[in-house]
Amino acid sequence: MLLWSLLVIFDAVTEQADSLTLVAPSSVFEGDSIVLKCQGEQNWKIQKMAYHKDNKELSVFKKFSDFLIQSAVLSDSGNYFCSTKGQLFLWDKTSNIVKIKVQELFQRPVLTASSFQPIEGGPVSLKCETRLSPQRLDVQLQFCFFRENQVLGSGWSSSPELQISAVWSEDTGSYWCKAETVTHRIRKQSLQSQIHVQRIPISNVSLEIRAPGGQVTEGQKLILLCSVAGGTGNVTFSWYREATGTSMGKKTQRSLSAELEIPAVKESDAGKYYCRADNGHVPIQSKVVNIPVRIPVSRPVLTLRSPGAQAAVGDLLELHCEALRGSPPILYQFYHEDVTLGNSSAPSGGGASFNLSLTAEHSGNYSCEANNGLGAQCSEAVPVSISGPDGYRRDLMTAGVLWGLFGVLGFTGVALLLYALFHKISGESSATNEPRGASRPNPQEFTYSSPTPDMEELQPVYVNVGSVDVDVVYSQVWSMQQPESSANIRTLLENKDSQVIYSSVKKS
């Protein structure tokens, strides 16, 4: 009887065990939620309930409860079942086993690069490659790239590619990428890849001069441009003056060229220059460049030179213009009251002259202008007053001399006439009173009578008009004689008592 009772109880327990069921999805994808539901009779009390995976207890409850896996991963794949324990040991129950397989939503990403040994300064393209499951092509992914735990670019992006415009030697290191769903449930990381950036030595260093107008001018800005034809990375540029050998300046930048500026060039800055460039390899030097500094002309000085103490009509006036500073060639312009007279150049610097034959209209202000292409400078005005014509003064002096001679000759003629009359009267008186036997007078004594046709005409024996350098401008010497007859002309010419008239006019 007892045995029969035990068989009845065992049959009842077995019947209840068959009623404990585990409900779970058999196939899920990464990131999906998994709900395990253990179902059984609720008319009897349980001491505990548990969920198991591969014979390992996952979770224990005091009543029937669901077991939730929020986001499935591949490791969640396995055999699941649930169990209950009643108040009596005969009430222990175990559910059916459900095999769950978690499928991969997308493959583990792989980092690829356009080059894993790029040239410094060149671009690099990174790509995070993966593939979605054909059953879940509608899932959206986002990507992020890293170098040595540093996020590259703008961070997470829907694009699986990253373009780096230029990489440098310091960009050498380990790179990887991550891919995740936009819901952030599944995130996968690629393996790390090593990228080594190659540096290229610099080559062909050159020094170039840049100045306003293409020429270096005192007081203006000068730029010394040092450049390299090739090379990568940070380049250190330095500038030198050959005469001193000391560095004028230094710049380090990631560029193929750099500038050194001289704000205001001085005349002493003229000379030879060169530059050097270095990017960590052997420094390279440029060729030496000679830099001439052109000097603008200073304010010129105008000097006037004339033959006499005062300029006069007919004089040759020399206008000399000179700028004490200024690079040649210098062009000089000469002006009379803002009217251009002419120009003259000084190819080697210094001053220049311009000659002007003066007329009465040349009185006024004179000035000059100097220009060597770097700006014109004008001198101060110099006033000039022109006196009367020199030829006119000479004519007046000549006329005065002639009038003076005529006056002297007239006075002399009157005196000679009175002298002749006086001697004639005296002779007649002597002849009347002279005895008949008286002897004739001495042949050397003169008896003046009226002039006869044979009387020798007055002739000048010396005439001279002095040159400009002699004070005497006109002189005459006259010899006046009244011989009794042509026979004694020689005797009279040899007579020391002959009357001689000298006259001369000197320049006042």
UniProtKB/Swiss-Prot annotation:
Post-translational modification: Isoform 2 is N- and O-glycosylated, and phosphorylated.
Disulfide partners: C128-C177, C226-C275, C321-C368
Motif ITIM motif 1: where in chain: 446-451
Residues linked to a glycan: N204, N234, N343, N355, N365
Limits of the Ig-like C2-type domain: 20-98, 109-187, 201-290, 300-387
Residue ranges with Polar residues bias: 441-452
Region annotation Disordered: where it falls in the sequence: 429-453
Keyword Glycoprotein assigned: yes
GO BP, one annotated term: cell-cell signaling
Role summary: May have an regulatory role in normal and neoplastic B cell development.
Name of this protein: Fc receptor-like protein 2
Source organism of this protein record: Homo sapiens (Human)
Gene: FCRL2
